[in-house]
Amino acid sequence: MVYFSDIFNVDESILESYGAMNISLLNDIPLFIDPFLLYASEKPEYRQLHENILDYLSFLRDKASGFISSEKIKRWYTFPEVKQNWLGYSESGNGGLGLGKDFGQSMSKAIQGVFPDLKNEKITETSHLEKLSLFKVGVGRDNISDFTCNLIKKYLLEYTQTFAMQYLSLEQCKNIAVSKVYFDYKYENWMSQKYILPYFNGDYVILTPKDLLTKDETWINASEMRHRLLDITSSLPNDELRDQINDIYLKQLTKKKITNKLMNEAAANTIARFPILMDYYIKIKEEEKENAKNVSKEVVLSVDEVFIR
């Protein structure tokens, strides 16, 4: 047996009532954290985590207006993968690439253009980290999930420590100094902190709440945005702009054989020309936030049944 409940001799019902995923400690489970679920939640602590992410993005955006040295990019943008949560798509074990120099450089160059109205949005209810993945700036789904996991790591560590102190013996845990736990805005640096955490096979373990997890794609994603271009365009309040965008999109589909690839390329070209469409797409996704929570429940249940039960 390789699951957390087996290794630490905890009944599955205890993990279930706590709300934590019963992770495998042999291979990653194909789930990841979707930051949209923080925004969509009614839990005050999740909504605060969403705000904390925006605060850090605001810090990065403001700093991006000047010169950023490679040392600061490394300090502010690069993170190791939080492999101790045993989530992701590794074929064996729980190793991953994390967020390295390429991610840091891509994001530092893009952040001002992607978030001109950060925390002061005029179309959407709020800002969303996932907007970075809608631009072709070298930031994809895995980057978004890894970045989110690092930005809420303090919460996840506290969540795990609380469980460990309540349900595990001291022999099953270890007092660990974890790096890059929280950001000190006074010193502009990530700080370490100690936690009492479950310990197995030479490393600590992090538990993750089920209601933060999804599979395949984040709720806000570029693939669906391209697929729903006509829906997005129809939601525009400006009739003239809506007609102009439709004309530009349809003129790219004049070939006799209209393929999915051609439609995808036409949608991508149109969105690149009218980036305001991204904001209206995000607005639609905000309005559908209850569906995001339902999808999360369904995919977590399906993974639970296939990989655990």
What feature does the model see in each segment?
Residues 1-171:
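Long, contiguous, compositionally biased segments that the model treats as domain-scale units
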Residues 176, 180-309:
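The feature marks a conserved, polyanion-engaging helical scaffold used by nucleic-acid processing enzymes
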